[in-house]
Amino acid sequence: MPRPKPDDRSDNVEKLQDMVQNTIENIEKAEETMQFASPEERERIREKNRRREEAIAAMRAEIKDEAAAREHGYQ
């Protein structure tokens, strides 16, 4: 039976930062499309962007945790 690969957290901070940037870009694109959307679609976009903002906050907290773990050698 093959052994599982060890947990490689060495690039987690960078991956999370990319995810934050992509999410910010998605928010901006969604806001641009709102001018062409119906009132119902605008409300759905607003709700989705609120969830995206919450996700960004969680990812930023995870970035801090991962950066601290990196400094302490992932103990």
UniProtKB/Swiss-Prot annotation:
BP GO terms, sorted: asexual sporulation; sporulation resulting in formation of a cellular spore
Pfam families the record matches: Tlp
Protein induction: Expressed only in the forespore compartment of sporulating cells.
Main location: other
InterPro entries: SASP_thioredoxin-like
The keyword Mitochondrion appears for this protein: no
Subcellular location: Spore core
Alphabetized UniProt keyword annotations: Sporulation
UniProt similarity note: Belongs to the Tlp family.
The protein's name in its UniProt record: Small, acid-soluble spore protein Tlp
Organism, scientific name: Geobacillus thermodenitrificans (strain NG80-2)
